[in-house]
């Protein structure tokens, strides 16, 4: 039974010792030998501490320059972390390193032998002291060691931390304020309500600010996309309209309408030339007033003149014709222009008479022709025609 118990104790001790731990080393005092480093031909010396895990040959080093204020600088703690291993396998040594003054290569100017920090005997002593003076706190392993070289003697304090890191606070010393489960649920509800509707201390939280920013950016992106689409559609539409206007002629040919102007009282269509140059004949008129005064065309008047031949014109006839022409000119315009005539089924207004006055011929003198075979004087009357002579008298 005793052997089994010892085996269990050793296994438990080994399990505890192989867990992670921290080692903190603080240099308390260093004594230097005068002129030692000068005679050793070491330039730019530095004091260096080396921690070594012997089974795996893992080393952690730290050094300080040897200057005027070295005592103040060296009092800083040197903390090393070991994820696995035993504290009994940790050894420590001190060195003075620098460069050779003659050749300039790095060299070790002075060093001390390696010393185990926590040997097996020290562990037994600590366990015995803990039994004699039990305390509520877990044992904190700490001890002072001295290392000695040719030019220095150093005294250091080493502390082992197995439960927590040196800078971590003790959880037993932290005061924990308890909270009931009901109050916790009430606190969660109050927190959610404050996030939604805001609270007196903080109106909006960081999450709400992020959500609002994302929403604003989304709205700006949608508006920008809509405006761009509208501008693009308007541009394409204007471009199409410009192309259509370029295909069509801009200027239409100018057509003068002066030649086609028609007076209100004139005819509605172009009349033949013979109707424009002379008045209308009797059969084309329909008014009573125009039928009373018979108008003849210039051609008819000329034929009548030629028909009269050498006979003199009747003055009464000429005067009546002239009187009728004056009456026609003095007639009211409405009576002249409102007379209509029909031709080819179209009824239109009668055009005004020409403004050219008929020619006035001077009165002709009467000619007396003496007879050839008879002594009887023959006087031609004005009413006689030139065709009355059969031609026998003149022969």
Swiss-Prot record:
InterPro entries: C05B5.4-like. Residues 350-362 have a biased composition (Pro residues). Residues 286-395 are annotated as: Disordered. Disulfide bonds: none annotated. Residues 286-306 have a biased composition (Low complexity). Residues 364-385 have a biased composition (Polar residues). It comes from the Eukaryota. This is Uncharacterized protein R10E12.2. It comes from Caenorhabditis elegans.
């Amino acid at each position: 039974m005793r052997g089994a118990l010892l085996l269990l104790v050793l296994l438990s001790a080994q399990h505890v010792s192989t867990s992670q731990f921290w080692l903190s080393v603080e240099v308390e005092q260093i004594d230097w030998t005068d002129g030692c480093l000068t005679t050793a031909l070491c330039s730019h010396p530095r004091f260096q501490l080396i921690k070594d895990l012997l089974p795996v040959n893992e080393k952690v080093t730290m050094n300080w320059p040897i200057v005027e204020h070295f005592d103040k600088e060296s009092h800083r703690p040197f903390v090393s972390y070991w994820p696995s291993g035993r504290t009994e396998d940790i050894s420590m040594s001190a060195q003075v390193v620098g460069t050779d003054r003659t050749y300039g290569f790095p060299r070790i100017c002075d060093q001390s032998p390696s010393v185990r920090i926590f040997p097996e005997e020290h562990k037994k002593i600590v366990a015995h002291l803990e039994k004699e003076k039990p305390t509520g706190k877990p044992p904190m392993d700490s001890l002072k060691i001295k290392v000695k070289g040719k030019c220095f003697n150093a005294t250091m304090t080493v502390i082992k931390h197995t439960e927590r890191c040196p800078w971590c606070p003790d959880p037993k010393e932290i005061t924990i304020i308890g909270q009931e489960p009901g109050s916790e649920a009430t606190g969660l509800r109050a927190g959610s309500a404050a996030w939604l509707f805001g609270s007196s201390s903080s109106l909006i939280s960081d999450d709400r600010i992020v959500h609002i920013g994302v929403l604003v950016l989304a709205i700006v992106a949608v508006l920008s996309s809509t405006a761009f689409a509208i501008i693009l559609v308007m541009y394409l539409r204007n471009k199409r309209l410009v192309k259509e206007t370029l295909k069509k002629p801009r200027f239409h040919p100018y057509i003068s309408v002066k030649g086609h102007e028609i007076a209100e009282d004139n005819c509605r269509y172009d009349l033949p030339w013979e109707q424009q140059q002379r008045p209308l004949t009797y059969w084309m008129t329909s008014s009573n007033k125009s039928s009373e005064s018979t108008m003849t065309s210039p051609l008819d008047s000329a034929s009548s003149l030629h028909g009269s031949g050498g006979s003199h014109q009747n003055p009464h006839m000429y005067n009546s014709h002239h009187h009728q022409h004056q009456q026609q000119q003095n007639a009211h315009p409405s009576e002249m222009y409102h007379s209509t005539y029909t031709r080819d089924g179209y009824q239109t207004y009668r055009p005004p008479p020409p403004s050219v006055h008929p020619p006035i011929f001077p009165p002709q003198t009467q000619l007396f022709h003496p007879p050839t075979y008879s002594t009887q004087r023959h006087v031609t009357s004005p009413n006689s025609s030139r065709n009355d002579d059969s031609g026998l008298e003149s022969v």
